[in-house]
Amino acid sequence: STVDRYNDDIHYKNGTHLSAQLSWAGTMLAYQSRTPDIDLVGDQWKDMWLERLEGQPFFMEEWLAHQRRDDFWKHGSICEDFGGFPVPALVIAGWADGYRNTPLKAIEGLGDKGKAIVGPWIHKYPHFAWPKPRMDFHAEAIAWWKRWLDDADNGAEQLPQMRAYILDGPRPTLRRENDPGYWIAKKDWEKPQTQMLTVAADGTLNATGASEGTGDIYLRSPLDTGTSGGEWFTLKPDAEIAGDQRSDNGGSLTFQTGPLAEEAIYLGAPELTVDVTCEGDWENLAVRIIDVHPDGTETRACYGVLNLAHRDGNETPTNMPRGEKTCITMQLDAMGYRFAPGHRIKLALSTSYWPTILPSPQAPGLTIDTASIRLALPLLGDHERITVAEPENPNPLPQYEMRSPEETRRSVEKDLVTGLTHYRIYEDTGLEVHPQNGLRTQEIRNEDWSIDPNDPLSMKGDIDWNIRIERDGWSVSTKTTTTMRCTNKDWIIAASVTAFEGDREIFAKSFEQRIPRDFM
């Protein structure tokens, strides 16, 4: 869920263009193309399907027509008027999910009407989500609804305003099954006190107040910087979660503390202030806060991105004043994280975070005044340790019979002949049989993002889906394609839907549109 459809949803983030927007548009194009089940609707299935196919939209056309915060996004954003939202709300999210900011923003806006829970999870319900530990979501939800829908006297209104799982140095792995950490509660949520980190003359990140810095540094990250960032929208605890950050640091400007003498625990949204100079109209800035383990392994604790044309707000973006030093303040995503003694805190700045965000059309880079860097980290403050009940059933999902195996592939390829970097995703659900109704389905997604590290206009995104649905004596399928290209002035998007009854094509439709870039 989100309280802010523009900044905390799958489309845009602080004025940057999320690649997840095209991915989700391609996903929805494929999902909408699926046929009705012949066993449920009978002989009218084909007429219903053709009507559905004829009428289905390509959502990217509408989303890309609203690149700034306008009424289209305000309409579904309760942050526009929290006072007009009278309903008590229990808001739940996970640190590994793109919607991690929602619980904190909700309780800050709703006050006593809001309660928040943030676990370690991806974008799944907490009773079957990864990474573990899980939470008994059913018990939490039922108690909440009984209190507010059935007037049950169960004390739900007395719940702590914030319950959060503090991540305790999880290591990047091929699959994040379990994240170390512990649950805390804060009875009342207040704006956290902060610890201020600055850059010393020797380049170290420190909390002493010394901010001599190392001078002005020009930063223009290779445009393929960011391939260890995982997905904005996480559905699996594998490479969709950010991996070891060292591979992205080569294209970044980094500063780190010495080994910590004592633990440092944070809960909330960090804030970075920095003076930058831009020789172009605008540029993107990505910021990562990293936990450096004693052996050098690096875990991303949180990150944030900003299109500098949106530095003063998302409704009326403006060009940067060329050649003039400009003070930028940006809020990063929320985190709940413990840096252990002996670990280091690293700050990484880059002008690219691909493929998570798409590059600006000029990609001019930025000159960073390192003496101006101020990183405000939100301290955990007063709290109590708590336990959170886990679900009684550790494996609640139905078990599907597999007629063909599932497969996932994800890779980064640097082509030394063309100079392109490819980020490729292949997912095949396998042919599975629904345990209750016997419907057989298979979904295959093939996604390819590519870019020349020196040319922002070389960016391409290609997404293909193949969906197969069958019963004995009945087989239908759809193939969808979704693409994005760009010029200095336009986004170029295209899509197609083709439907088959057996091997025979019975429907085809295509979309293509050129949409002007709007400070993006």
What are these model-derived regions, one by one?
Residues S1-V3, G119-P120, A348:
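Alpha/beta-hydrolase-fold catalytic nucleophile elbow
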Residues T2-G84:
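Accessory cap/linker subdomain of secreted extracellular hydrolases
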Residues G83-F85, L110-G111:
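Short, conserved loop/helix-junction motifs that constitute active-site signature segments
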Residues F85, V91-A93:
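Short beta-strand/loop motif that positions the catalytic acidic residue
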Residues W95-Y99:
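Acidic catalytic loop of the alpha/beta-hydrolase fold
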Residues N101-K115:
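Active-site-adjacent alpha-helix of alpha/beta-hydrolase-fold enzymes
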Residues G111-Y125:
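Catalytic histidine neighborhood in serine/cysteine hydrolases
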Residues P131-F500, R504-M520:
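C-terminal, loop-rich substrate-recognition/catalytic regions characterized by aromatic stacking residues
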